[in-house]
Amino acid sequence: MLRRWALRQYGVSDAAVIMAVAFGVSALLGIVRQTMFGATFGDGAAAAAYYAAARLPETFISFVAGGAFTAALVPLLLAQADEAQQQHLFHVVLTTVGVAVAVLSLIGIIMCEWFVVTILLPGIDANTQQLTISVSRLLFVQPLLLALVSILSAALTAHKRFSLIAVAYIVHNPTIILGVWVAQQWPVLSIYAPAAGLVLAAAAKLVFVSMGIRGLNWRARWVWQPHLPQLHQVLWLAIMSAHHFVLQ
């Protein structure tokens, strides 16, 4: 029964209801998350380091996984002549974007010390700077996971499978809540626990949408074809969409 629900196809109106419910549940859990976070860390150095550390990875995520690739890829998947061509485009985009985001994330990990010390927190004490750098490096695992989630979600959207996309959206806050709870139980973990919760949230999202992809009988494959014209269309549309999302 759960499998049937997870793989069911929905029309536009039903999909809108499902996603609206997911947004509502996530918003309520977000209130719980913020309340617990504030009660645990207040406005001290750990909280300041957490929010500062998230700034650079979140800016990157806005470009690579803020819905831009989903919005760009769905119409091009639907425009393909058959499912074989859909899968080919899907694999090319997955491979190319995965490699590009992995490389950029690695650069972010290497450069974040310079960014924090020189631009983000130049006048803050060394301990807070170091905590911010360490947490930022941990959070740079997110962009690759969320970029893959965005691409897999596009394939599910093109096939009108919204259930697992909604579940993936909901799991974001519970994992962070779990991280805050862990920090309460083991204070030595401090702000690293909710930061790990953020990474766990991205991993959980990837697990759920991957289940949906398996339900389509699609399998992730390495297909390196950077000169494919449809790939260039996806990347251009994604850049335009990301620019719009970031400006909002």
What are these regions, as identified by a protein language model?
Residues 1-248:
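Membrane-embedded alpha-helical bundles of multi-pass transporters/translocases
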